[in-house]
């Protein structure tokens, strides 16, 4: 009898006894059940336990940061939009918002929606040689120079370009210092006092090497409201 004459169901499996249809189904069922158990275990561990643990640690160790880094009008840190006895939260130290008028330090431009739209975070996606971007930058440079009373060639880049998120809360120390004279004059404050306030709000590079020195616009403007002429 040749191999071709032997029924396929009785051909011995490599290294063992013949495998029947029933044994194949049992093996498949066992493998499937093992895979489902691994899936279930990882779902509970990584989809439920781990997020809850991280959330719990965040609430215990970094409650302010974990709840959005919210600030009230007097600069107090709160963990809820409802705020505290000093009033409701008016913004986040991590989210840029619009300030207009000569009495405030201005943030960098925003391309998020119609401007500072948290539901449409993003940049303009225009390349550095795009005519629309170049025209917009020139227009912004002229406007900022006129507002701050400086030469257009000295306007810092972040004063005329939007961030990748459109929600950058920070500006460069150079842009903050450029606005000092305007803000001081509008509020009737000595230039030296406003300049000192800016210096107090300059934060260095993260871990000493990451990013650039920066100034949080919301925190700076909140501190500005406490200064009397």
Model region roles, listed by residue range:
Residues 2-27, 34, 46-47, 54, ...:
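Flexible, solvent-exposed loop/hinge segments and secondary-structure transition points
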Residues 178-229:
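Extracytoplasmic/periplasmic C-terminal soluble domains
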């Amino acid at each position: 009898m040749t191999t071709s004459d032997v029924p396929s169901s009785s051909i011995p499996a490599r290294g063992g006894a013949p495998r029947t249809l029933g044994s194949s189904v049992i093996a498949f069922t066992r493998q499937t059940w093992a895979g489902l158990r691994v899936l279930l275990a990882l779902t509970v561990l990584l989809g439920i336990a781990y997020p809850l643990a991280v959330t719990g640690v965040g609430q215990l160790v970094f409650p302010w940061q974990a709840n959005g880094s919210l600030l009230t009008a007097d600069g107090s840190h709160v963990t809820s939009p409802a705020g505290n006895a000093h009033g409701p939260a008016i913004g986040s130290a991590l989210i840029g918002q619009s300030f207009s008028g000569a009495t405030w330090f201005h943030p960098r431009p925003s391309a998020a929606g119609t401007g500072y739209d948290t539901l449409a975070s993003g940049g303009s996606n225009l390349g550095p040689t795009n005519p629309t971007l170049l025209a917009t930058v020139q227009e912004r440079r002229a406007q900022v120079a006129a507002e701050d009373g400086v030469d257009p060639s000295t306007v810092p880049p972040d004063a005329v370009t939007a961030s990748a998120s459109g929600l950058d809360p920070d500006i460069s120390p150079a842009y903050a210092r450029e606005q000092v004279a305007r803000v001081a004059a509008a509020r009737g404050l000595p230039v030296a006092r406003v300049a000192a306030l800016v210096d107090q709000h300059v934060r260095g590079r993260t871990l000493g090497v990451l990013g650039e020195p920066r100034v949080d616009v919301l925190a700076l403007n909140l501190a500005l409201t406490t200064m009397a002429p």
